[in-house]
Amino acid sequence: MTRRCSHCSHNGHNSRTCPNRGVKIFGVRLTDGSIRKSASMGNLSLLSSAAGSTSGGASPADGPDAAPTAADGYASDDFVQGSSSATRDRKKGVPWTEEEHRRFLLGLQKLGKGDWRGISRNFVVSRTPTQVASHAQKYFIRQSNMTRRKRRSSLFDMVPDESMDLPPLPGGQEPETQVLNQPALPPPREEEEVDSMESDTSAVAESSSASAIMPDNLQSTYPVIVPAYFSPFLQFSVPFWQNQKDEDGPVQETHEIVKPVPVHSKSPINVDELVGMSKLSIGESNQETVSTSLSLNLVGGQNRQSAFHANPPTRAQA
């Protein structure tokens, strides 16, 4: 028993494998009329026209949904009814020319990054500040990706032309004529005339000796040019300062700092006069027997004998 499709009533397949049912994605069945033109499906108009010619008008692409499919561009461009091709050109944008990009580079070099309004007003007059900022972003991305891989030549690969800043030289004027048009140097003063004359004579003598050594053919080809003015040589003496030492003369002595010595108005007090102690001796002579005794004589003290001192020998005991 052959299979019979419940969708198209044809034999040989079922409803799941029927080619006329379309595509089912996430439970939603899509037909050819609901598919609009996209970037990956740019040949839908050709397919619809080919299907219409083969099927004789039986294809669903010839229905009312075929009009937006056959139109050029994206379906989102025709969202507003009655839109013209001018709006599409405005959305697409006008590409930058080389002259505009050259002016943009010059403005970027002069004003720096961020001043898109100044670049738009002074350099790229035909572009708005927003367009200048967008162009700068693309330019910087291109410059950062230059070393990654080899790319096609683009407008962003242009090098800023620095010759636009420099004003052109007037025609027929050469640098040599500019040097000749410079004002002459002021004449030397009377004080310097003698030195300058001596230097001039020495220079002329050197030039004459050089011309005598050079052959005739070189003189005609390379003439000797003598400068018209020489800077004078001034002789001046170096002043001798007084604080400098003369090698031949005597060496001067430096001043010494005199420190004051304090002078006491009163004589210093002798401690031995206030408190006197006897000297200890071991009977060196008979005359010093009296002084050998230990005694402490205080100023203004009593004359009585101390208990700690021995009695001096008397004449009777002797």
Swiss-Prot record:
It is found in: Nucleus. CDD domains: SANT. One of its GO terms (cellular component) is nucleus. Keywords: DNA-binding, Metal-binding, Nucleus, Repressor, Stress response, Transcription, Transcription regulation, Zinc, Zinc-finger. Gene3D superfamilies: Homeodomain-like. InterPro entries: Homeodomain-like_sf, Myb_dom, Myb_dom_plants, Plant_Stress_Dev_TF, SANT/Myb, SANT_dom. Induction: Repressed by sucrose and gibberellic acid (GA). Induced by cold stress in roots and shoots. Induced by salt stress in shoots. Down-regulated by abscisic aci (ABA) in shoots. The keyword DNA-binding applies. Residues 88-144 form the HTH myb-type domain. Residues 116-140 bind DNA. NCBIfam families: myb_SHAQKYF (TIGR01557). Plants over-expressing MYBS3 show increased tolerance to cold stress. Transcription repressor that binds to 5'-TATCCA-3' elements in gene promoters. Contributes to the sugar-repressed transcription of promoters containing SRS or 5'-TATCCA-3' elements. Transcription repressor involved in a cold stress response pathway that confers cold tolerance. Suppresses the DREB1-dependent signaling pathway under prolonged cold stress. DREB1 responds quickly and transiently while MYBS3 responds slowly to cold stress. They may act sequentially and complementarily for adaptation to short- and long-term cold stress. This is Transcription factor MYBS3. It comes from Oryza sativa subsp. japonica (Rice). The gene is MYBS3.
